[in-house]
Amino acid sequence: MGAIKLKHTSGNGTILNSPAANPSSDITLKLPSTTGSAGQVLSVASANHSSTNAELEFAAAAAGITEADSWRITSNLSSSSGTFSANWERTDTEFNKLGTGLTESSGVFSFPSNGLYLLHFHSTGAGNGDRYMGVILKVSTDNGANYSTRVENYASVYNSGNNTWGNVSIDVLLDVTNYADFKFYFNHSSSGTITWYGDTNNQWTGLYTLRIGDT
């Protein structure tokens, strides 16, 4: 096996070994003409790429998760239907947002940038003699002019009297391609009056979002 050693003046150095297996033909790797910048990585350029020839270029490294945010309702809401429109706060217990974070106004949320987002909503409620409780995600892609139901989820609540508890959650991936016009909020619906629990120190009812990649 052939090797090239780039020797340091003190004796040791860096060794470049030949391939572990014999290629079907010679392979040409063309190095970049610049040194790149801090944080960049070497990648194969799309131009002039083939099974035996590749040009290398410096490119930005994958950013990973650049946005993470969490919100919750701070006080109880008792109703049979309506919108989770009031008493929202950004979670401040063992949490700090990553990136810019969501913006919220009267329960309507907006994303800070385009991307593929994981959205999770969870809720806890209790009622007296109710059969079901549900949460509906409403989404607008035209800056709030029109909303459509994107996800709707219900839980069965056993009719057994006072303080019959239930939980409803929503998980969805949202491909946000025009964040300036993308908005969402949550409705609730039940067979009778449900008390949806909220607390400034506990995530009884709330949401979190993660930007997991580019659109």
Say what each PLM segment does.
Residues 1-65, 105, 112-114, 129, ...:
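Extracellular repetitive beta-rich solenoid segments
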